[in-house]
Amino acid sequence: MKKDTKNLYKEKIVPSLMEEYGYKNVQLVPKLLKISINRGLGEEARSSKEMDANLKELAVIAGQQPTVNKARKSIAGFKIRDGMPVGASVTLRQDRMYAFLERLIHITLPRVRDFRGISAEGFDGRGNYNLGIKDQLIFPEISYDDVNQLQGFDISIVTSANTDEEAYSLLKKFGMPLQARA
């Protein structure tokens, strides 16, 4: 599975982007650097049982053990103390990144009800794409019976592209169902 996406990039996407943007060197062609998956835990961080369930869900979705993000300073208004767990994140690179991207594009996103493509507004101006997932049940790895509470997370796709247009073209060639840019 991961080899297919990686080979697609090397054999079809790189030559296509070189022709489209007039790159003289293969190293100039934009590529995927990493995919970060981040989830804020909120109230679930107080209960170790729910925290473990959240970490397990992220591990199943990403195929890699997440790291726990802890608060850097205390904020009384949010009832957060320094060092308390506030979120979890996973950074995928290389083969796991390509495997996750392929599952996201071909299996997960088509499972969304009334799906018409993802917004092209998620680019940050530097060639990276951010996507918010509202609930974890769109992933086939997650069983409905195991979920205590619907909770979303953020996916950041980091590329080496310099502009949003290059990143849009790169992701579109991977098969990402992006809506047309305005």
Curated annotation (Swiss-Prot):
Compartments, record wording: Plastid, Chloroplast
A GO molecular-function annotation: structural constituent of ribosome
InterPro entries: Ribosomal_uL5 (IPR002132), Ribosomal_uL5_bac-type (IPR020930), Ribosomal_uL5_C (IPR031309), Ribosomal_uL5_dom_sf (IPR022803), Ribosomal_uL5_N (IPR031310)
GO CC annotations on file: chloroplast; ribonucleoprotein complex; ribosome
Keyword Aminoacyl-tRNA synthetase: no
GO biological process: translation
Family per record: Belongs to the universal ribosomal protein uL5 family.
Protein name: Large ribosomal subunit protein uL5c
Organism the protein comes from: Emiliania huxleyi
